[in-house]
Curated annotation (Swiss-Prot):
Induction: In PHH4 (a deletion of the p-vac locus) transcribed in all growth phases, maximal expression in mid-stationary phase. An unstable 6kb transcript able to cover gvpD-gvpE-gvpF-gvpG-gvpH-gvpI-gvpJ-gvpK-gvpL-gvpM is detected, as well as smaller transcripts. Gas vesicles appear earlier when grown in static culture, possibly due to O(2)-limitation. Keywords: Gas vesicle, Plasmid. It is found in: Gas vesicle. Encoded in a 14-gene locus called c-vac which produces cylindrical gas vesicles only in the stationary growth phase. GO terms for molecular function: structural molecule activity. This is Gas vesicle protein M2. Belongs to the gas vesicle GvpA family. It holds the Pfam family Gas_vesicle.
Amino acid sequence: MNPTKRNSHAIVEFVDVLLRDGAVIQADAIVTVAGVPLLGISLRAAIAGMTTMTEYGIFDGWDADHRRRNAQP
């Protein structure tokens, strides 16, 4: 039995879902040397299309300012 769905479009479908629905990545790390904590890292990243970002209230001000600046002649 051969598969009926081809995997050639998998990356396109992944990007489509990522832009439509978005994703949030959060990571925390502590760098220690000899048991002594030296550096703390906290990372939060969101990736999505601008439509999704503005629906969730992310980049509202930036999007409005950017559109206003680009609309001026």
